[in-house]
Amino acid sequence: MLVKQKIIPKKDGIKIINGLKKIEKEIDKGKFKFKEKFEDIHLNIEKRLFEIIGQSAGHLHTARSRNDQVVTDFKFWIKNATLDINDVLNLLIKSILKKAEKNIDTVMPGFTHLKNAQPISFAHYLLAYVEMLIRDKKRFLNNLELIDECPLGSAALAGTSYNIDRKFTAKKLGFKKPTGNSIDSVCDRDFAIDFLSAAATCAMHMSRLAEDFIIFNSEAFSFINFSDKVLTGSSIMPQKKNPDPAELIRGKTAINYGKSVSYTHLRAHETREDRGWRGGGVK
């Protein structure tokens, strides 16, 4: 974009692109040496670029701030994570549907207050979770619409005096359009809060399913069996087969709740960009 807008010479733009590609390969191969004295990833890459292409690397920072770059990177991460989660949810839904199809005529009790209430099929029970997971997918994918705006060009918070083309940059990076307000652009982390909220709701559904399976697997119910591959035994009671995976899924739900709430609180300050949002152990 900087070359297109004649902000920097074409030869320097080519050098920067080639240099960044070389750095990318070094990072992918684990050969890039990060140095703490250079403060962060941005300065590490910039210093390495100077080593590779010389003074042309000075143009790298033109019309750009860490503020707009960080939120852009964050949006990329959320996008990729959302698509990965969507793929996993699709596989889980297909697996549940396959199991439901085989159990259309399998009768089981439906419960209220953990007491037998009405007869249902096991398929009907499983399909309840399909509905939950479909809603989870929608929550994650709806957030992609909110993410699909590119913050680059907002700079520190008030834009830049360079004659940049934000629409061109947004399109090149796969965004639908540039963001509308530079202050909001660098302060916005709503998309992360929405992502964590969707993750917490999805985790809650997984916890419910895990708890159901723990109960159904118990001797009192004996509705389902787990493969020995995922069960653990006891050091003193040889008859024990413990559903550890389901228990771990249930237990980790609290982590998702905590991250969602703590990150929301971190963002509840006046309209500005600072490093506070990176605290609190939220990763």
Task: Give the residues covered by each predicted segment.
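A helix-coil-helix interface module used to build multimeric assemblies
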Residues: 1-159, 164-171, 177, 232-234, ...
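Charged catalytic carboxylate motif
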Residues: 88, 125, 132, 198-201, ...
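Acidic, glycine-rich loop-and-beta core segments that form the ion-binding/anion-interacting portion
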Residues: 179-260
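Conserved small/polar residues in nucleotide/adenosyl-binding loops
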Residues: 264-271
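Hydrophobic alpha-helical segments, chiefly the membrane-spanning helices
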Residues: 275-283
